[in-house]
Swiss-Prot record:
Keywords in alphabetical order: Chaperone
Name the UniProt record assigns to this protein: Co-chaperone protein HscB homolog
Gene3D superfamilies hit by this protein: DnaJ domain (1.10.287.110), HscB, C-terminal domain (1.20.1280.20)
GO MF term (any one): protein-folding chaperone binding
Family matches, as PANTHER family: IRON-SULFUR CLUSTER CO-CHAPERONE PROTEIN HSCB (PTHR14021:SF15)
Matches recorded under Pfam families: HSCB_C (PF07743)
GO biological process: [2Fe-2S] cluster assembly; protein complex oligomerization; protein folding
Claim: Chaperone is one of the keywords in the record: yes
């Protein structure tokens, strides 16, 4: 299903999330199962299915990484059963540095300072990756979409790193 069509958006990475929320509320009102309480079982089931589609579509378009994956899938690049690895050696080296920094936090006398530095580093890198991703997805050609898929892979890795850092910080607070 094309969630951009469902929410009446032109397929694009950069969308107005305020307008998305507004259209979500409108669609929820239109398809809410309570509106079909006196209808046939088939109509009730359809209302439940439509509500699920609206919810899934909203959460997909609301989150930039999921939105990018959806846009790529519409363009023929499916990342749902991803097995491709990142081949960017500069990024892989940076990844190793970040992993070492995460490990160093556990043995640090000033862990919060290192945590803050890593959050800043992750945030800056994610911002750059999202900017590049947005540019690539505007091009809408096969080569750009394959490069965009690499950006999505990197951003997924960054999300995992962010989660690991959050877990380390939470463990230090316990």
């Amino acid at each position: 299903m094309n969630y951009f069509n469902l929410f009446n958006f032109t397929p694009s990475f950069d969308i107005d999330t305020g307008l998305l929320a507004e259209r979500y509320r409108e669609l929820q009102k239109a398809v809410h199962p309570d509106k079909f309480a006196n209808d046939s079982e088939q109509q009730k089931l359809l209302a439940v299915q439509r509500t699920a589609q609206v919810n899934d579509g909203y959460h997909t378009l609301k989150q930039p990484l999921r939105r990018a994956e959806h846009l790529l899938s519409l363009g023929g690049v499916d990342l749902s059963h991803e097995t491709t690895t990142i081949k960017d050696t500069v990024f892989l080296m940076q990844q190793m540095d970040w992993r070492e920094a995460l490990e160093d936090i556990k043995h640090s006398k000033q862990p919060q300072e290192q945590i803050d530095e890593l959050y800043d580093s992750f945030s800056a890198h994610e911002k750059l990756l999202f900017s590049q991703l947005s540019h690539l997805l505007q091009t809408q050609d096969e080569v750009a979409y394959l490069k965009a898929a690499d950006q999505v892979r990197k951003l997924k890795f960054m999300a995992k790193l962010q989660q690991e850092l959050t877990n380390i910080e939470d463990a230090l607070l316990d």
